[in-house]
Amino acid sequence: GQIHLTTRQGFEIEGIHMEDMDKVNEMLQPIIDNLQINQNEAGTGYPASGTRNVCACIGNRVCPFGNYNTAAFAKKIEKAIFPNDLHFKIALTGCANDCIKARMHDFGIIGMTEPQYDPNRCVSCGACIKGCDKLSVDALKMENYRIVRNEEKCVGCGVCVTKCPTRAWTRSTKKYYRLTLMGRTGKKNPRLGEDFLIWADED
């Protein structure tokens, strides 16, 4: 057969002759074991045809905007849901930039942080205010040379953290997430996923 890499980084082997199926399954078994994929019966190949890979952006391991380790969280989800024949798609993104397009999936997880402000480190330069205004939702303002965050407007993106030159803004130790549901692409009814939970924790 021929190996095909799907858009969700899944491997498909096309054109296998039926008489070669047992041999191919035997060759695949070490790979399935190494990936720790749930399997009811060894030697029978991958146990589901409809499973969609969980997708994730690069997360905070590399990206300065990422609010959490997306790959680690994605692996936890994979262990809980694989294998299955449900044609639903899950995506995780580290911040509100949504590079993975989580809102276009059935189930999207968007990383959030609750910015922590230390007025003793603040020099009132206004870099965070400008950054939030230009790149996010304009949730910051200055009062008496101190920054005030509008908690209702803040989307937890962390732009203020990346813009602050003195580390007066830092990310919260606790990780938060925005969960979106029922996003989809397609010809007839494409739609963005709607918020289901905001400021949720991993549990």
Spans of features found by a protein language model:
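Small-residue-enriched alpha-helical segments and adjacent helix-cap loops
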Residues: G1-V123, E152-K153
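Hydrophobic residues embedded in beta-strands of well-ordered beta-sheets
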Residues: F11, P115, Y145-V148, Y177
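Short, catalytically relevant binding-site loops at active-site mouths
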Residues: A96-D98, I147, G186
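Short beta-strand elements
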Residues: F107-G111, Y177-G186
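Short, conserved aromatic-histidine micro-motifs
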Residues: R121-G131, N189
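Iron-sulfur cluster-binding cysteine motifs and their immediate structural context
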Residues: A127-R146, V159-Y176
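Cysteine-rich micro-motifs
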Residues: C154, G158
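A hydrophobic, small-residue-rich beta->alpha segment in the mid-to-C-terminal subdomain
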Residues: K175, R184-D203
